[in-house]
């Protein structure tokens, strides 16, 4: 990534070195005018090669500005690198004469930071900048990125157990799942509650949060043999209950 950001800088270094060599040769050469014309042609060729390199640099800077991760430590590392790029690396490139690289790096990252700072100001939560996203979900004060569905429906599914659930890389313990709620803030605004707790065969649970109640859950993952085994267990339990 770092190499892709400064391909244009390397191009200008090559052009500058080539110009210095040619200028030194011009002092000792008899046909000075002809050499100057040849030097101009070489620099023009280098300038034409600069455009695709500039495009690649812009793409890499944009990728860095928009890249997001769900891991807390990764987000902290990326945020620190962005701050260093805006406050140190970009101005340093401008000071050394690499104006295009410095201006593009500083401008793109700064605009993204200002855009996310608006959500930070409105919701008073720094996690918008940390996770580099415009929409977060908050589960009892713990923030995590909110992923929209394909139809832009607002619902959340969290994996967990009988008295806990995982929120990103954190574990939330609870007594009653019906007391757990999720607040969606940012570009979307919604308050979700638990509408269904789906128990898996291994004893774990999938908790469904939605604004609309869940009527039922259709299970199509089991084979016929597993379904027959479950039916037999249910019949045995019912039979035991009737006898008692």
Curated annotation (Swiss-Prot):
Annotated ranges, domain CoV 3a-like viroporin TM: 41-131
Topology of this chain in the membrane: Multi-pass membrane protein
Subcellular location field: Host membrane
Keywords: Host membrane, Membrane, Transmembrane, Transmembrane helix
Cellular component GO terms, alphabetical: host cell membrane; membrane
Iron recorded as keyword: no
Record domain CoV 3a-like viroporin CD: where: 135-214
Transmembrane regions: 47-67, 75-95, 102-122
Pfam families, per the entry: Corona_NS3b
Primary location group: host cell
Family, similarity comment: Belongs to the coronaviruses NS3b protein family.
UniProt protein name: Putative non-structural protein 3b
Organism: Porcine transmissible gastroenteritis coronavirus (strain Purdue) (TGEV)
